[in-house]
Amino acid sequence: LSGANQLSANPTLRRTNRIRTIHGSLAIEQNTLTLEQVTAVLNGKQVLAPPKDIAEVKNAYEIYDRLEELDPYSVDDLLTAHGIMTRGLVDEAGMFRSKPVGVVDQEGHVLHFGTLPQYVPDLVMELLNWVKNSDVHMLIRSCVFHYEFELIHPFADGNGRVGRLWHTLLLSKWNPAFAWLPVESIIHDRQEAYY
C-alpha cells in the first residue's frame, strides 16, 4: 500500500487498473466482454458485443470515475451509484427494490432469499451507520459491509456490482491506494470462493 504515491503519479497505471477493476467486477456478473474489449469501449472504439454489456462497461466506468465524490456512509450516494451503475439496464435504477428477490444457481436452486423489500431501507441505513461508527478496523468493516450488503440484497439487480464498488469506496477512504487497486479482478479470479 505504500505504492499509493506511485499510483497517483502514474495515470497510465491508474487507468489500466481501473479497466481491470471494471472488467473483473462485470465478468463476475456474466458480462461477456474481454479485457481488450472493455479497453476498446472505454477508448471510444466500436466493439461487436451485446449492447447491454457495452452499457454496463460505460456505466461502471462513470461511477468508478466519481469514486472520490461519494460519501461511503450516505444512503443517497449509494442510490446514486446504483442509478449510474444500472442506468438503462433495469427499471428500478437508483431505487431500493419493491419486490422480493432471491439468488439462484445455474440449475435454478435458490441459494439465498433477499430481505423483504419493506425492511431494506432501514437495514441499509443501519449497516452504513455501523460501518461509520464501529471501532473495528476498516479492513474488517469493509468486508462485513460487503457480506451484509449482499445478504440484504437491496436492489432488483446490480447488488454485486454496487457491493464491490462500495467495498472499494470504503477501503479507498481509509487508504487512497485502494481506489486504484483492482480488487474486483482478484475476486473474479477467485469467484468460486467469493460465492
Can you say where each PLM-predicted feature lies in the sequence?
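FIC/Doc superfamily catalytic core
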Residues: 1-195
